[in-house]
Amino acid sequence: MFKKILVANDGSDGAKKALKIAINLAKQYNAELYSISVEEGVPHYAATIGEIEEFRKEADEFFVKINREAVEEAKKEGIELHTKVQAGHEVETIVHYAKEGNFDLLVIGFMGHSKIFGRVWGSTSQNITKLSPCTVVVVK
């Protein structure tokens, strides 16, 4: 049923739960497993080149760490996890990569927000679900 699975990994608790589900599904369906981590860019408050460089260094270290942990977790279950870090807007980048990679399934974690926040900003998981070219599993 699923031959190629993509999991979104931002290092959050929701993403960790999504990774566990994605690993189990990859085992069950003997599917290839990929992860995408999105670096959303330099904060607007970064005023100097030094601050920008420090932010990028910290982001690089963070993504190396979470992806190393994800690869190790998958390996324990006998699954090879291919990781990618991409700069961009979270929703657009994940949806584009899902289309580009011809994935059968996208697994994402859910982060709860207040009703007001959801109305004003929309929900990342909701927007990904609307725009995704493939089946989406949202893990709570």
Predicted regions, residues:
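A short acidic, glycine-rich active-site loop
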Residues: 52-65
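Conserved beta-strand positions in the Rossmann-like core of class I SAM-dependent methyltransferases
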Residues: 34, 82, 137
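Short secondary-structure boundary segments
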Residues: 38, 109-111, 140
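Short, hinge-like loop/turn segments at secondary-structure boundaries
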Residues: 50-54, 100-102, 124-126
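Glycine-rich, Arg-bearing micro-motifs that act as flexible, cationic patches
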Residues: 105-130
